[in-house]
């Protein structure tokens, strides 16, 4: 288990329990207490938890591991999911993409797809996004037209949120909205950790002809703080081959296993 995977597991345990002792965390993750103490100290320095004598408590209900750390988790699954999701995009499409590790991989897959190329100076696809990192990577690609929302930048996810971000989606129509999520549950729908992110993701879904959730199996059956949309509003789920997706298929969601 890498350090970033361990950090994510520690934060998940804190989210569910509220507090952890060093000994409890070491037993849960089968690592030494010295390793856990270092992890707690480093996470406390980043204000992602509060250090206590002998352990730690959750800093806030809605925290999330920064994108730069989450990108190391389940990387191969996310790349396969992204490649399969990218195949859903036809030349000339206008798509919405939110922030996240899987959607970042999707953007990279679209950037390198051989059949998408600019003709007579016109881009092959248009991507509307609120993710600064995705816009930064794709703005140099001549076959991609990038529309970046305004808004307030979140340091954890590099996403722009707020009225300025939502306002852009009021003015556009999308063929597909690609959503990365923190949790996807048949009863509770698609969720994320931040209510402002949920708001703009919801608006993106409303403006799209089709809604595609790209999520690895660790997100299925999970829920986070803020609801994005119900399962009935999701057309396609792209996930990894090991995922148990029967409940989603029974709910009418088309599933693509990558």
Name these PLM-found stretches.
Residues 100-101, 217:
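Active-site metal-binding loops of divalent metal-dependent hydrolases
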Residues 2-7, 11-23, 27-99, 107-127, ...:
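HTH-adjacent hinge/linker in prokaryotic transcriptional regulators
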Residues 60-61, 106, 168, 186:
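Residues at secondary-structure transition points
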Residues 102-115, 188-199:
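Short Gly/Thr/Asp-enriched flexible loops that form oxyanion-binding sites at enzyme active sites
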Residues 2-25, 30-33, 45, 77, ...:
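Conserved phosphate- and dinucleotide-binding cores of soluble alpha/beta proteins
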């Amino acid at each position: 288990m890498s350090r970033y995977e361990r950090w994510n597991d520690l934060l998940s345990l804190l989210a569910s329990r509220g507090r952890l002792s060093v000994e409890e965390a070491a037993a849960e993750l089968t690592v030494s207490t010295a390793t856990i103490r270092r992890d707690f100290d480093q996470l406390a320095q980043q204000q992602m938890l509060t250090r206590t004598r002998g352990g730690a408590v959750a800093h806030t209900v809605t925290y999330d591991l920064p994108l730069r750390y989450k990108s190391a988790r389940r990387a191969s699954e996310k790349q396969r999911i992204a490649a399969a999701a990218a195949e859903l995009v036809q030349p000339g499409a206008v798509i919405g993409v939110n922030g996240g590790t899987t959607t970042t991989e999707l953007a990279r897959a679209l950037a390198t797809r051989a059949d998408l190329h600019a003709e007579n100076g016109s881009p092959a696809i248009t991507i509307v996004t609120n993710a600064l990192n995705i816009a930064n990577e794709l703005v140099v690609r001549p076959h991609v037209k990038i529309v970046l929302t305004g808004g307030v930048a979140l340091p954890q996810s590099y996403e722009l949120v707020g009225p300025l971000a939502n306002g852009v989606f009021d003015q556009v129509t999308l063929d597909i909205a690609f959503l990365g999520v923190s949790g996807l549950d048949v009863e509770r729908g698609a969720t994320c950790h931040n209510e402002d992110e949920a708001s703009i993701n919801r608006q993106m879904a409303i403006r799209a002809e089709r809604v595609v959730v790209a999520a690895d199996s660790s997100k299925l059956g999970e829920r986070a703080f803020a609801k994005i949309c119900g399962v009935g509003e999701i057309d396609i789920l792209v996930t990894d081959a090991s995922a148990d997706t029967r409940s989603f298929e029974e709910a009418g969601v088309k599933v693509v296993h990558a």
